[in-house]
Design a protein with these regions (language model features):
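Bacterial N-terminal signal peptides
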Residues: 1-8
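Short stretches within intrinsically disordered, low-complexity N-terminal or propeptide regions
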Residues: 8-12, 123
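Short glycine/proline- and aromatic-enriched beta-strand/turn motifs that initiate or cap beta-hairpins
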Residues: 13-56, 62, 66-68, 157-159, ...
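Generic short beta-strand segments
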Residues: 27-30, 101, 141-144
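Solvent-exposed loop/turn segments connecting transmembrane beta-strands
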Residues: 35-45, 69-77, 110-111, 147-153
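Gram-negative (and chloroplast) outer-membrane scaffold detector with strong preference
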Residues: 51-123, 128-130, 136, 140, ...
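Predominantly the C-terminal beta-signal and adjacent terminal strand-loop region
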Residues: 131-180
């Protein structure tokens, strides 16, 4: 994870333009650490991931994320925001983020239990441009740390989908000298 953050922070001289705004929507699968809830194994949850991001300067922006994953006896949703680091290479955009927010879980056992607690997501991924406005998020992987029901959960989320982007943060080049 730290290597991905370091790679995103290093800016080569020939870096490509970056999108000003990105909106991602897609499928997600979470391997949820539900053993702390009394389940015998971790739960495989399917759902969605939605993430708008606004890139402030080259290589850095702010991202928000809303996701929901659902299983037969367990639902999990999170909302988080934080810094995003970008590293464009040709038609590929690598990114890493650190998001902090809250998670909500509903366990359908007996009368059912709900809890909302803090959540931290550390992750990154890769987008591949299809057109000037659309890209496919080839992969996004997030480590999610939650503390639902006064227990720690270490979860892993995989996402893929479509990214819509507009506006660009252009590379600053040399200006031609003004002729008198």
């Amino acid at each position: 994870m730290f290597l991905l953050l370091a790679a995103c922070a290093a800016r080569p001289a020939g870096a490509q333009d970056e999108p000003r705004v990105q909106v991602f929507g897609g499928y997600s699968y979470t391997r949820f650490d539900s053993r702390s809830f009394g389940f015998s194994d971790s739960s495989g949850l399917n759902g969605y991931n939605f993430s708008p991001a606004f890139n402030l300067i080259r290589g850095f922006g702010v991202a928000a994320e809303l996701s929901g994953q659902y299983g037969s006896k367990l639902n999990f949703r999170d909302l988080a925001v934080g810094p995003q680091f970008l590293y464009p290479r040709g038609k590929t955009l690598f990114f890493a983020h650190v998001l902090i927010g809250s998670a909500r879980s509903f366990v359908r056992v007996g009368a059912g239990e709900r809890d909302t607690e803090r959540a931290v997501a550390l992750g990154g991924g890769m987008d591949l441009d299809l057109t000037s406005r659309f890209a496919v998020r080839v992969f996004q992987v997030d480590y999610l740390h939650t503390t639902l029901f006064d227990e720690k959960q270490n979860n892993l989320r995989f996402s893929t989908g479509i990214v819509y982007h507009w506006g660009t943060l252009k590379r600053k080049g040399h200006r031609a000298p003004v002729q008198p």
